[in-house]
Amino acid sequence: LELAQRAEKAALDFDPRIINSEGATVSRAVGGSALVTSGGFRGYGDGSYVSLVVSPLTEEADGKKRRGHHWAARRFLAELDDEVEVGREAARRTLRKLGAKKIESAEMPVVFDPDAGRAILGLVSSCINGGSIWRKSSYLVDRLGTLVSSPLVTIIDDPLINKAPGSRRFDGEGLASRRDVVVERGELKTYLLDSYAGRKLGMPSTASASRGSTG
């Protein structure tokens, strides 16, 4: 509670144009899961997760409210970003929305905020998922070994990064997790497959199974 209060206060104190807040929220979870398969695998994994979200409000000259937010998340509370800086960054992002307006459609250079990376990777992930490939519902069907992006882009699926939120020792089928280069300098190198999708495509699993889905 105190951590959330300090974060919210930092946002409100940052600039007089921050007129209010929709609150600051701290969420924390600790849990574990066991996996036993008919193939003889038995495994157990546990972990924790903590996040902080701050949502300040500002106001246009015409009275229109603008809402912004910033967040931080880590495996462990002791490693969470400083709550005061999270609050201040939330205020900065909120103030950037002042004067925002619609523009006509056009082709132009775009600078992505770092947070946009998560959304972009989510879209890429759905397109390289084995289920999407064998069902032929992805535009990346039959694109292995071809350029699918700028040569400046390299994407790595690495569930072995120490303390990373998505890290795991084994996948949903009990196969040992591994690091895969998905896109290297713009070239599509692999799809992400569980055993079923791998069999459908005649390819080995990349240990990418998640419980309750095929990919």
Where are these regions (language model features)?
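Internal alpha/beta scaffold segment
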Residues: 14, 47-124, 128, 132, ...
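Dual-mode signal for accessory low-complexity, basic/Gly-rich regions
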Residues: 7, 143-215
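Short acidic, glycine/serine/threonine-rich loops at helix termini
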Residues: 30-49, 64-72, 120-126, 166-169, ...
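Hydrophobic alpha-helical hairpins/lids featuring a short glycine-rich hinge
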Residues: 1-50
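A glycine-rich phosphate-binding loop feature that marks nucleotide/adenosyl-phosphate handling sites
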Residues: 23-31, 104-117, 158, 162
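Gly/Ser/Thr-rich active-site loops/lids in small-molecule metabolic enzymes
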Residues: 47, 56, 79, 133-137, ...
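Amphipathic alpha-helical
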Residues: 129-149
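A generic local secondary-structure boundary/capping motif
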Residues: 7-15, 38-46, 55-56, 96-101, ...
